[in-house]
UniProtKB/Swiss-Prot annotation:
PROSITE patterns: TRP_SYNTHASE_BETA. Transmembrane segments: none annotated. Pathway: Amino-acid biosynthesis; L-tryptophan biosynthesis; L-tryptophan from chorismate: step 5/5. Pfam families: PALP (PF00291). Gene3D superfamilies: 3.40.50.1100. It comes from Buchnera aphidicola subsp. Acyrthosiphon pisum (strain APS) (Acyrthosiphon pisum symbiotic bacterium). GO terms for cellular component: cytoplasm. The gene is trpB. This is Tryptophan synthase beta chain. The beta subunit is responsible for the synthesis of L-tryptophan from indole and L-serine. Disulfide bonds: none annotated. Belongs to the TrpB family. Keywords: Amino-acid biosynthesis, Aromatic amino acid biosynthesis, Lyase, Pyridoxal phosphate, Tryptophan biosynthesis. Its EC number is 4.2.1.20. Its cofactor is pyridoxal 5'-phosphate.
Amino acid sequence: MTLLNPYFGEFGGMYVPQILMPALFELEKNFVSAQKDAEFQKKFFYLLQNYAGRPTPLTLCKNLTKGTKTKIYLKREDLLHGGAHKTNQVLGQAMLAIRMKKKEIIAETGAGQHGVASAIACALFNLKCRIYMGIKDIKRQNTNVFRMKLMGAEVISVKNGSGTLKDACNEALRDWSSSYKKSHYMIGTAAGPHPYPTIVREFQKMIGEETKKQILEKENKLPDSIIACIGGGSNAIGIFSDFINDKVNLIGVEPAGYGIHTGKHGAPLKHGRTGIYFGMKSHLMQNKQGQIQESWSISAGLDFPSVGPEHAWLNSINRAKYVSITDEEAISAFQVLSRKEGIIPALESSHALAYALKLMKKDPTIEQILIANLSVVEIKIFLQYMMF
């Protein structure tokens, strides 16, 4: 029996080989006890403030919205140590690993940001780190590969399948199946078998808590909409979490890639089917035979054929709205923010920004406050941009 509800509505669960069930139960037990442990919480928030650099700013884009009645704010997770929101939850998971007396960390990565964050946490806590990464992603994110190796991580190239994030996830799970007694699998997003979606949300929820406090200080009211890009969904659930019970539009932006009609996209929430993948029940991209269909996005961090179960649930009850943005639209938003505000966003975050700009342009006379989560800084983005 689990200590926490493993489902979000019909989504979630623990669809893993029986051999991994004790490891998941152990993880859940230690997570629940850590949440009640004042010393654990004190150390976690100390690290967030004094090592990671929280709180992150909420920046008003004055030039971007000139001539309209829209205000667009950016939640600057790109300024966090490591360059992404990923650092938040890996610090928490590393502390859980130590609590469980695990000395080795297994991780998967797509864009490389979770790999970098995992390497950061392992260096800080003196843990052995091995990171699985698709060969395709290694080629387009070699700067992050260098950063991981510099901090002592072993980067394992995955050549199976499409050589992207889904294949790295599969290999990481295989590794954990044979090494779980001494290793902790540090999943990088709010997906996977229970209790990972809950753990990641709880270790990311300070994004939403800070955002609410900051916008109330600046505007004395809540925003009209919160907008975040969706791959697995950790940055989005982090910023959504504190607004779920408020009258605020929650908008998740999936990658439409070359266009939904082409089939070259990564939008399982609105254009996929319910199925079992990566240890969970959620929406995923499938072909007519029910096999996993390859996803596509110019952004490696969004190139994932499924999505976290809490997002699937929020979609099913119509609490959050999920839309899609093409590669071309994301590139345009990337250019506009860079030139208008001097802030260079990652391609992941450019999807969220692109939808915010769409809302602004729809009717410039409407007074509205929009917050886009700028979840990642991408030092490799220039090569991707030039190749596009």
